[in-house]
Design a protein with these regions (language model features):
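Phosphate-binding site recognition
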Residues: 61-411
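Major-groove DNA-recognition helix of helix-turn-helix-type DNA-binding domains
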Residues: 12-38
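A short, Lys/Arg-enriched interface patch at domain edges and termini
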Residues: 41-60
Length: 411
């Protein structure tokens, strides 16, 4: 008899995929021994003749179901018109600790923008009663201590996910446009008796996009001060995909300009800003602290190595099982595990969400949906200077060999 781990190596699939096959009864003679399974030595890997065509999924999938949110990052729309995987307990985990400034680093297409928009909708005070978008979600079951924060803060929200240009001039113009749009969301400040004429003059500069580069670099700091004065409540600042323009600067030769701007931009917003309730940033990379976060001692970094928030970006095994059940294709679980169950965030095994929703939406045809969803210039540069030892380890990984790395992470 062999273990699931031994069979996984022989069949070249994940241990969880083998376990799932055992649970579903697809491996004749497999028996459970305590918490593990024992598999006959002569067992062969179950074959699904429908894998290549996806015909089973197309015929068997229930059609009277909400569509999956491919490319949808609007929380209100996602949770009302599409199949939504409830990630609202991220709010509880945050409120239990209340770090002043949080940075979440995750791979691209892992739901960062959708989660940040969820935070915006939850916390932002508006004329609309936005509690209706959370009353059937997990966060609402957590009690009044958490509900008391709903709709109680002014919010500044920016996403840099589309700031992808070949020059510094085009980049700064796009950032100026984003600030113009965000200031436009807060035009109530222009009629506020608590805002000085000087501040309103600056506000109109940003609104008309006539401010210079230096003035623009302090726009977050100044807007947070005006919102705090008007509402008697310091705002929450959310910056999504903060590192996108920095990556572009690295690959397009304007790195010094973007780093210099971002250092002042973020320093004014997050460093010793008394007009800040909380701050959230998301990105793919951890840019060196001395580059743009110099002196920002209140920054809490949450990477793929950390247990905190490990289940809120990407799909967990339970969430994938529920999704497959909803669409009536539970038989596809082992195949989906084999293809897309490839991440360990903290202590949580995580599926690539972009691949999962595309796989189900496109008739359960397995393929590399995540390929070519972003740029890899930085990785390419790292590989060019990689040592022979690193190259050897990479070859081992490509051959399915498990390797051990000892490393330290620095900001």
């Amino acid at each position: 008899m062999k273990t699931c781990k031994e069979m996984a190596l022989i069949w070249n699939i994940s241990v969880r995929a083998v376990t799932s096959l055992c649970k579903s009864g697809r491996i004749p003679g497999a028996v459970k021994n305590g918490k593990s399974w024992e598999i006959p030595d002569e067992a062969t890997k179950p074959v699904d003749g429908r894998i290549s065509s996806g015909e089973y999924c197309k015929k068997g999938m229930t059609t009277d179901r909400k569509p999956l949110p491919i490319g949808i990052s609007d929380y209100v729309r996602a949770q009302s018109d599409y199949y939504y995987v409830d990630k609202t307990m991220l709010i509880k985990e945050f409120l239990d600790q209340k770090p002043l400034v949080s940075l979440f680093t995750r791979p691209r297409r892992f739901g960062k923008t959708l989660n940040m928009d969820m935070l915006r909708v939850y916390f932002e005070m508006t004329d609309e009663d936005t509690s209706k978008y959370f009353e059937d979600k997990n966060i609402w079951k957590c009690g009044k201590d958490y509900r008391l924060h709903q709709g109680k803060y002014p919010v500044i929200f920016l996403t840099f996910k589309d700031v992808k240009f070949d020059s510094w001039q085009a980049t700064i113009e796009k950032i100026k446009s984003l600030l113009q749009e965000e200031y436009g969301r807060h035009q109530e400040l222009l009629s506020s008796l608590k805002i000085s004429d000087y501040e309103k003059e600056y506000f109109n500069k940003v609104l008309s996009a006539t401010e210079n580069e230096v003035e623009l670099s302090f726009s977050l700091e100044k807007l947070s001060k005006m919102l705090a004065s008007h509402y008697d409540k310091a705002p929450i600042i959310i910056i999504d995909e903060y590192d996108t323009p920095i990556q572009e600067g690295y690959s397009k030769d304007f790195y010094d300009e973007i780093i210099g701007f971002m250092r002042n931009f973020f320093s004014g917003a997050f460093k010793d800003n008394k007009n800040l309730s909380y701050g959230f940033l998301t990105g793919i990379l951890r840019i060196a602290q001395e580059s743009i976060f110099s002196g920002l001692n209140n920054l809490t970094v949450n990477s793929v190595m950390d247990e905190a928030y490990d289940r809120y970006f990407g799909f967990t095994n339970e969430e994938v099982s529920e999704m497959l059940d909803y669409y009536g294709v539970t038989e596809k679980e082992s195949e989906l595990q084999e293809w897309y169950d490839g991440y360990l965030f903290g202590n949580e095994e995580i599926y690539n969400p972009w691949s999962v929703i595309n796989y189900i939406s496109k008739g359960c045809v397995p393929q590399a949906y995540w390929v070519n969803t972003g740029k890899n210039e930085i990785l390419e540069d790292v590989l060019k200077v990689a040592t022979d030892d690193i190259i050897e380890k990479l070859y081992s990984l490509l051959q399915g060999v498990t390797i051990k790395l000892f490393f330290a992470l620095y900001l």
